[in-house]
Amino acid sequence: MEVRYKPEELTKLPRSVEYKERTVYMINQRLLPREFKVEAFRTVESVAEAIKNMTVRGAPAIGAAAAFGLALYAETSKAKSKDEFMDGFYKAYETLKNTRPTAVNLFWALNRIKKLVEEHLEDPLDEIKSLIVNEAQKIADEDVEANLRMGHYGAEVLPEGNLLTHCNAGSLATVHLGTVGAVVRVMHKDGSLKLLWLDETRPVLQGARLSAWEYSYDGLNVKLIADNAAAFVMQQGLVDAIIVGADRIVANGDFANKIGTYMLAVLAREHGIPFFAVAPLSSIDMSLKSGKEIPIEERSPEEVLTCGGCRIAPDVPVYNPAFDVTPHKYVTGIITDKRVVWPPFKRNLKKLFGEQ
C-alpha cells in the first residue's frame, strides 16, 4: 500500500486535540454544529471532565486527550521531590482513567505513559517530566499517521459507490482525519466515493451534528437519514458497503461501537452488503476473548428524554447504553493501520500482533 496523500490534502479541519504551552486545546464537540469553538484546559480535572461529558469524544481522541492530561500534570506539578511528583502522577492517572469505561484507547494511552515513567524512575525528575510530555505528543502524532494509513488501506478494499456510516468516526473522533473519516476522504479524493449516507445516531446525534458538519465542510457528497431509515435504503439497493469505527475490538473480532452498530451489521448480512470496521491497533484489546467481556457504558437518561435541550418524553424509566457489541460473524473485514484483517479473526488478529 502506498500513502498517496498528506493530511492537509484530505481535510481543511484543524486537529481536534492539541497540547502547547501547558494547555490542552480541544474542539468543543457539544457545541457543534451551531458553534465552532476551540477551548483551553489547564488542569487535569478539567481534561477529565471534558472526556466524561463528551466535550471530546471518539476513542482515539480521548486517548490523546488523556495523554495530554498527564503531560499537563507533568508541566504544572509543584512537587519538590520525585516521590511527591509520583504520588500526584498516580492520582492524575486514576482521575483520567475513571472517565469512560468502554474505549480501550483511553487505557492504552495512559498505561503506555505510566509504563514508560516506571521504566525511568531512576532518571532525574526533569527528564521524567520531559518523557511524559514527549510521549503524549508522540501518541497524538502517531494517531494521525495511523489514520492516514487506514485511509489508504480502506480505499483499496471498499467498492466504488455509496457507503453508509454510523455515529462519527471522523476527524473529530481522532486527533486528525479520522478512522472512517480517513477512508472516505481518500475515496473522495480518488473519485470512488459517490455518496456517504449518514445515520443521525440517536440519542446524542453524532451523525447529524458532527459527521454531517465535518464531511460537508470538506466537500464530500453526504445525505443524512434517520436511524430507522437505514434498512430501507439498503433494501432499495442504495448502499454498496457499510463502514464504521470501533471503540474496542477483542481477540475474536467482536467489537464495541456506538449503539446501533450491531443493528446495521445484521441488516448488512440480510441485504448482502459488505460490513467493515476501521480502527488502529491501539483500539484492539487482545486481553479479552469475546465481546461479552467488554464493559458497556450506560449514560444519563436525559440524553434520551431530551433532544437539543428540549424535553421530548414524559418522566419514564430509560435504558441508555452508549455502545453495543457486534459479533465477528457479521464483519467482512477490519481495516487497521497495519493492514486489512480478514476472517478467521481469532487467528488473523493474533497473527497481526505476532508481526509487531
From Swiss-Prot:
GO terms for biological process: L-methionine salvage from methylthioadenosine. Keywords: Amino-acid biosynthesis, Isomerase, Methionine biosynthesis. InterPro entries: IF-2B-related, IF-M1Pi, IF_2B-like_C, Initiation_fac_2B_a/b/d, M1Pi_N, NagB/RpiA_transferase-like. Coiled coil: none annotated. It catalyses: 5-(methylsulfanyl)-alpha-D-ribose 1-phosphate = 5-(methylsulfanyl)-D-ribulose 1-phosphate. Substrate binds at R57, G58, A59, R100, Q206, N257, K258. The active site is at D247. It is an enzyme of class 5 (isomerase). Its EC number is 5.3.1.23. GO terms for molecular function: S-methyl-5-thioribose-1-phosphate isomerase activity. The record marks C167 as: Transition state stabilizer. It comes from the Archaea. Belongs to the eIF-2B alpha/beta/delta subunits family. MtnA subfamily. Catalyzes the interconversion of methylthioribose-1-phosphate (MTR-1-P) into methylthioribulose-1-phosphate (MTRu-1-P). This is Putative methylthioribose-1-phosphate isomerase. It comes from Pyrococcus abyssi (strain GE5 / Orsay). The lineage of its organism: Archaea, Methanobacteriati, Methanobacteriota, Thermococci, Thermococcales. The gene is aIF-2BI.
